[in-house]
């Protein structure tokens, strides 16, 4: 069961990911962050995204993996999380 602090951090990470993706992604594909899971030690976070159209999922995931360090640097500038997690992106199936 997640603590209130973890829930807040997960919500913040999803919100920041949505803003970053809206700013940096191309206009041909809709990438929407749905949720984030933070590890118990708060050092790693997985962001689950949905992609439309569905056949662009691999391209969108490749884009996100290329930009994960830039996104983490953006988070570093805009948040005051005690531990800034390393980010991985995964496609959300069936959500």
Where are these regions (language model features)?
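Charge-rich, low-complexity N-terminal segments
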Residues: 1-95
């Amino acid at each position: 069961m997640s603590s209130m602090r973890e829930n807040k951090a997960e919500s913040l990470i999803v919100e920041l990911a949505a803003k970053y993706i809206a700013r940096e992604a191309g206009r041909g594909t809709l990438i929407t962050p749905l949720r984030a899971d933070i590890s118990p030690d708060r050092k790693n976070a997985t962001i689950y995204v949905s992609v439309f159209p569905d056949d662009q999922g691999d391209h969108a995931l490749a884009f996100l993996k290329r930009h994960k360090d830039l996104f983490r640097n953006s988070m570093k500038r805009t948040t005051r999380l005690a531990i800034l997690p390393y980010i991985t992106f995964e496609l959300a199936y069936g959500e």
